[in-house]
Design a protein with these regions (language model features):
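Cysteine-cluster motifs in flexible loop/terminal segments that predominantly coordinate metals
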Residues: 98, 104-137
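FMN-binding flavodoxin-like domain, especially the glycine-rich phosphate-binding loop
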Residues: 1-97, 129-131, 135-142, 148-150, ...
Length: 197
């Protein structure tokens, strides 16, 4: 549905849905935080979404900052070859910062206890530190848009890009991403030998 809407020219605001299971059990934490029952938490989330939809205007910046994340080699990657063409066409329309998340530079989330994740997240950090805390979190905060360069490995993201997404949880505790545009450049190949985007 999101892809069809995007292809039709729609822009989706950050967190554009309120998702409730049949029992609304996925609203337990929100209900506790709000001092209400499950239905009250669900309705509060829906009301907050309606307010954001009602007041949303697409941000206009003269020269937006774009963060580009990848986990590929510039020398051998079809994904990076396609990005080079896109980057060239962007010209000076935006400021671009690229961060490579290659093997060995990014540890995946190992599932800290909820309270520990909140503790570090409120400081804008993550227990596991590394490139995420030093480079990626500050870059995500500054960026107006994020581009994820994704080779398609058996209909899935690479491990490093999956780790990046998993580790965003700590940053989300402090920074909502509602004002950021998200783009993906996905490249599939036939055993890595042909470029199909």
């Amino acid at each position: 549905l999101a892809l069809a809407a995007d292809m039709a020219g729609c822009a989706l605001i950050g967190r554009p849905l309120v998702e409730g299971t049949g029992s609304l059990a996925n609203f337990r934490v929100q209900a506790k935080n709000l001092g209400t029952d499950l239905m009250g938490a669900y309705l509060a989330a829906a009301q907050e979404l309606v307010q954001r939809l009602d007041t949303f205007t697409f941000p206009q910046k003269e020269r937006p900052e774009l963060l580009v994340l990848h986990a590929s080699s510039h020398h051998t990657s079809n994904t990076m070859a396609l990005w080079a063409g896109v980057r060239e066409r962007l010209g000076e329309v935006c400021s671009v910062q690229e961060i490579g998340l290659r093997n060995g530079t990014l540890d995946d989330c190992s599932g800290c206890p909820y309270t520990m994740c909140i503790h570090f997240g409120e400081k804008g950090e993550c227990f596991y530190g590394g490139v995420m805390s030093r480079e990626v979190y500050p870059a995500v905060r500054r960026a107006d848009g994020v581009v994820i360069l994704c080779p398609n490995y058996n209909d899935a993201l690479s491990a490093n890009l999956t780790a990046f997404i998993n580790r965003l949880t700590a940053l989300f505790r402090q920074t909502r991403f509602y004002d950021k545009a998200l783009f993906a450049l996905v490249v599939s190949g036939y055993s890595g030998s042909d470029l199909v985007a």
